[in-house]
């Protein structure tokens, strides 16, 4: 599973991120097919360059015909969002193009607050950061796609189960 290679790299590189898409739904225990990793990152220059460096090292390239380091330029990111309707900056593996990492640019969360409230899962000696169930639900409500509405229903069931289990 290519996910682990990415998650291990994020952990070792000390990237400030959390998983917020279908993979987070899976990691909360909801079976669901997903092909990519949707992450939200702190958009400060240092953090962005950590992740772009990691992705380049692992063989990932941007789907857009731009330098990956352009993601560290707030003016370019603003232009992509406002003038090109870009919602996520996608990277794919140059030899295995089904391996996709989407850095979500447009969402309804305050990164610092959400990072503080993240859920930490431990696997093979690394910490994996997930958006809290509440934050995943907020993001999915913001998107409003059919699959997102189904995910919200299932996440609410997981939340209820966890609340009952933990008292």
Regions found by a protein language model. Name each.
Residues 1-167:
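Compositionally biased terminal segments of proteins
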């Amino acid at each position: 599973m290519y996910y682990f290679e990415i998650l291990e790299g994020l952990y070792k590189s000390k990237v400030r991120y959390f998983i917020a898409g279908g993979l987070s739904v899976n990691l909360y225990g909801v079976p669901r097919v997903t092909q990519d990793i949707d992450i939200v990152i702190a958009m400060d220059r240092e953090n962005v360059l950590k992740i772009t460096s990691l992705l380049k090292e692992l063989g990932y390239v941007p789907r857009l015909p731009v330098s990956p380091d352009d993601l560290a330029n707030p003016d370019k990111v603003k232009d992509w969002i406002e003038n090109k309707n870009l919602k996520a900056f996608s990277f794919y593996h140059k030899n295995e193009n089904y391996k996709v990492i989407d850095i979500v640019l447009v969402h309804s969360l305050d990164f610092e607050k959400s990072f503080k409230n993240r859920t930490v899962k431990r696997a093979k000696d690394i910490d994996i950061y997930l958006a809290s169930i509440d934050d995943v639900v907020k993001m999915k409500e913001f998107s409003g796609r059919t699959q997102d509405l189904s995910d919200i229903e299932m996440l609410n069931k997981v939340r209820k189960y966890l609340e009952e289990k933990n008292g």
